[in-house]
């Protein structure tokens, strides 16, 4: 499979992933803002519970980042939409994220990388952050208590966003986990 060039306009692409094609959507910054040399890869929630790159929180996060002048890349983890493979409980999904990040860095070496994840996507991006070394990490409703968060070393520039009335991710479990790991972070409670 030929590796596509990074598009200048909004585009849907297929990348070669670790176990086959990965479905990717690239969106440039909003037209009325100054573009920043940053690409934010936004990761979706649990695929076995319907998570896709089209998830409402994922698309809203990408839109907010584009309004700040960032280019966004959303993709489907293995087994979702046009992405090949089978669900791998976060391990293979980290490989998918690393493949997308490698493509971004090869195509736009002058750009900085941010990782953004919602729920399961927050778990995957947190686990991959040590290897990918993003400039910033944004974790929206990280599912503490639902997945093994041991060994996670977030970057210094880490934003955690947690809804106080979240019905899926227990807010107190997130707050307790943040206190236990004692990693520098900014917490936004909504």
Where are these regions (language model features)?
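Gly/Ala-rich beta-loop-alpha elbow adjacent to hydrolase catalytic centers
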Residues: 116-125
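Alpha/beta-hydrolase active-site loop
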Residues: 57, 87-108
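N-terminal cap/lid segment of alpha/beta-hydrolase-fold proteins
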Residues: 1-35
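Catalytic histidine neighborhood in serine/cysteine hydrolases
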Residues: 180-190
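Short, surface-exposed "cap/lid" segments of acyl-processing enzymes
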Residues: 30-76
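Active-site nucleophile loop of the alpha/beta-hydrolase fold
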Residues: 45-46, 138-148, 163-165
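Short beta-strand/loop motif that positions the catalytic acidic residue
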Residues: 154-162, 166, 174
């Amino acid at each position: 499979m030929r590796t596509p060039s990074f598009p200048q306009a909004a585009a849907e692409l297929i990348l070669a992933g670790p176990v086959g094609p990965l479905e990717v959507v690239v969106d440039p910054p909003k037209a009325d803002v100054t573009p920043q040399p940053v690409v934010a890869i936004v990761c979706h929630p649990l695929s076995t519970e319907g998570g896709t790159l089209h998830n409402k929180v994922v698309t809203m996060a990408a839109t907010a980042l584009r309004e700040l002048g960032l280019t966004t890349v959303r993709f489907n983890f293995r087994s979702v939409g046009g992405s090949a493979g089978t669900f791998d409980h976060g391990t293979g999904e980290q490989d998918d994220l690393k493949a997308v990040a490698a493509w971004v860095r090869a195509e736009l070496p002058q750009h900085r990388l941010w990782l953004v994840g919602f729920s399961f996507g927050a778990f995957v991006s947190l686990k991959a952050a040590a290897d990918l070394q993003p400039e910033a990490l944004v974790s929206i409703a990280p599912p503490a208590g639902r997945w093994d968060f041991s060994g996670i070393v977030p970057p210094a520039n880490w934003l955690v966003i947690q809804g106080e009335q979240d019905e899926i991710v227990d807010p107190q479990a997130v707050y307790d986990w943040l206190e236990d790991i004692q990693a520098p972070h900014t917490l936004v409670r909504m």
